[in-house]
Amino acid sequence: MKTRILTMIALTIIALGLLLGLKIGRKNTDVEVVNQAPSDTLQVKRVYNLIILDESGSMSGLEDVSVSGVNETLQTIRDAYKEFPQQEQLVTFATFSGTPSILNGNSYCRVKRHLQEINDVADFTVREYCPTDSTPLWDTMGLLLCELEEHVTVDDIVLVTIITDGLENTSRKYDSEKIRSLVNRLDEKGWTFTYIGANQDAALAAKDMGIRNSYQYSSDEEGTRNMFKKERSSRMRFYRNSRVETQINRLQEGYFDEDDKE
C-alpha cells in the first residue's frame, strides 16, 4: 500500500514538473518573439555618396586643408558604415577645373574614386590635387549625375555634395537651365543635393540650380576647415535619419539646419 502511494506521489511530482517546464518554455518563447527585431529593420540599403570638389585655380593655397577635409569626410562615411552596417556606403569622388584631363577622356571632370565601397576607398592625397584654371561646374555635374543615375535604383539613397569657391564660368555642354532641369528630375526621385560655396551668394547659386540645401563658407584655411567640420556632422545626422525616416522629402531638406540649432 505504501509503495503504491509513493509511486502515485512520484508520478504526480513528475507530471507537475513537466507541466511547469512547458509553461516556462512557452514564456521564454514569448519573450524571444517579443524581443526579435522586425525583419525590415535589417534590410540593407545602398547609399550613394557623390562628392564634387572644385580644383580650379582659386583653390590654390588651400590644397592641404582641402585634402584633409575630404579625408575626414571619407572617415565619417567609414564611421557611419561601422555604426549602421545595414547601409552599404558607396563613394564617387571627383574634382574639376578648366584644364581637360587626358586620363578622363579630355573631360574637365577628374574622377578620383568611382563607385567604390567605402572600405575600399583610399584616402585622397595632395599629389592628386593640383588647382588650376577655371570653373566648369555645370558640365561636371551633368556628366557625373547622369552616369550615377544609371546605377541607382528606386530604393537607394543618394547624397550629392558640391564644394566650390567660385561660380560656374567655363561649361560648354550644360547651361543653367539644363542643370536645373536635371537636378529637379533627380530631386523628384528622392536624391538629396547640398551646395557649399565661397566668394558668392551660395543660397542664390544653389536655388538657381534647383538645390535645396546650401552653406556659405570663407575661402581661407580656417573657413575651409570649419566648413568640412560642419559638413561631416550634417552628413552623420543624415545617415542616422535615413534609417528611420520614411518620408524621403524630409531627408532632402534642412541638411545643415540642425547644426545651427545645437
Locations of the language-model features?
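Positively charged n-region of N-terminal signal peptides that target proteins for export
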Residues: 1-4
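Acidic, low-complexity intrinsically disordered regions
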Residues: 7, 11-262
